[in-house]
Amino acid sequence: MTNIHTDKILILDFGAQYTQLIARRIREIGVYCEIWAWDHDPSEIAGFGAKGIILSGGPESTTLPGAPVAPQEVFDSGLPVFGICYGMQTLAAQLGGATEAADQREFGHAEVDVVAADALFAGLTDHAGASRLNVWMSHGDHVSQVPPGFTITATTDRIPVAAMSNEAKRWYGVQFHPEVTHTLQGQTLLRRFVVDVCGCQTLWTAANIIEDQIARVREQVGDDEVILGLSGGVDSSVVAALLHKAIGDKLTCVFVDTGLLRWQEGDQVMAMFAEHMGVKVIRVNAADRYFAKLEGVRDPEAKRKIIGNLFVEIFDEESNKLANAKWLAQGTIYPDVIESAGSKTGKAHVIKSHHNVGGLPEHMKLGLVEPLRELFKDEVRRLGVELGLPRTMVYRHPFPGPGLGVRILGEVKREYAELLAKADAIFIDELRKADLYDTTSQAFAVFLPVKSVGVVGDARAYEWVIALRAVETIDFMTAHWAHLPYDFLGTVSNRIINELRGVSRVVYDISGKPPATIEWE
């Protein structure tokens, strides 16, 4: 079996918003990599066995006392080093060069002139012309003098050192961000460093990852049984498919139907996993319990806690019926691992993420199986397709853990949930028919607990309002509202009002994030 972790890259994170993007780009090349905080125990660098080290960008200034620095072990390792933005600045400052604060921050598109061909830049061109490249800048400081042994490889009209290298040491730096798509040749630069300079083989593929994880799971659990909380979301669905392939009927999935899922989602989950794939799934119809617990509750955080705690309670009840289960499978993904690792000094960037499931009871005493813990979300999706899950399931828009409970403003009632689920299904159906679903990052309907005057036939109606929300985003930290065609919105509105009894008005949310959040609650 191929060892997919043999060739790997270590990324030291100095707090950049793009650090995870660097890792994702390297994984896309086909090479495994890990992100460590810049102040991670440096004695572990040699033992990690990386083929090369990348120093990320960051918000600090190398011109100020106490700025984060790369451990000396990085330079003593003999490994290739690639500094990006702040990473290049600290590379210069630590190796005898100089940095200075710019008169004005540089953010956005820029063009760099390649003035010396090294292993990264040789023969590289794009639409900007020969020896001139389109890049993306985001910096306040810049390198004013390169260290001894370094050559300036690129400049701009505003800064003297846009890139530098010491070919003998295999140390490289760029002031711009190759991981961002606006840098047109960025992926080529990263590939040249990872594959050509570091000599990594491209072994990190979906097929190899599946083979590796199947072997790991079988070795970990042996003949024991495993339970999994199956939500119908991407992560738990991929875990279910992967574990079923690895251990067959030793996997039992518990699917809690809360009554707050997408339209007919419970039936779809059962059809896909229980009927089509042959996975052992216990379906718990818990809608009555959820609506009873949520009666009279209007505060969003209170609703979230009730929904989460009740899931844990029901999952605990079902797991107690499975006496032979020794392992709990979870859909933990790599951003969760990065967040929990944190930083010793608190200066390194801590990446926040939303967890699908809250803490499970300590008395369960089950071992953890986390086959996705090395993967980013886009990698999880690719695994899902490789495992045979439908693309429509794997590439669905995000859905909040509390489900429709936070898309019904105020008190949650069964009739509200049924109305909203149907309205949402109409919106999504029309997006797919118009080939707009994949151009939006997230789209959904919201139930507003207010009534509006309308006219149905010749009679006055006083009925509910449905809001539609669609956004475009790269990272979900910021988002633009999707500029859907007016004719399309009219079609959706007409269908909702005509097909759903009790709705007299449909509105479209044109708020960006910030100031609004993507979800309404």
Curated annotation (Swiss-Prot):
It catalyses: XMP + L-glutamine + ATP + H2O = GMP + L-glutamate + AMP + diphosphate + 2 H(+). Residues 8-203 form the Glutamine amidotransferase type-1 domain. HAMAP family: GMP_synthase (MF_00344). Pfam families: GATase, GMP_synt_C, NAD_synthase. Homodimer. This is GMP synthase [glutamine-hydrolyzing]. Pathway: Purine metabolism; GMP biosynthesis; GMP from XMP (L-Gln route): step 1/1. Its EC number is 6.3.5.2. Residues 204-396 form the GMPS ATP-PPase domain. It comes from Xanthomonas axonopodis pv. citri (strain 306).
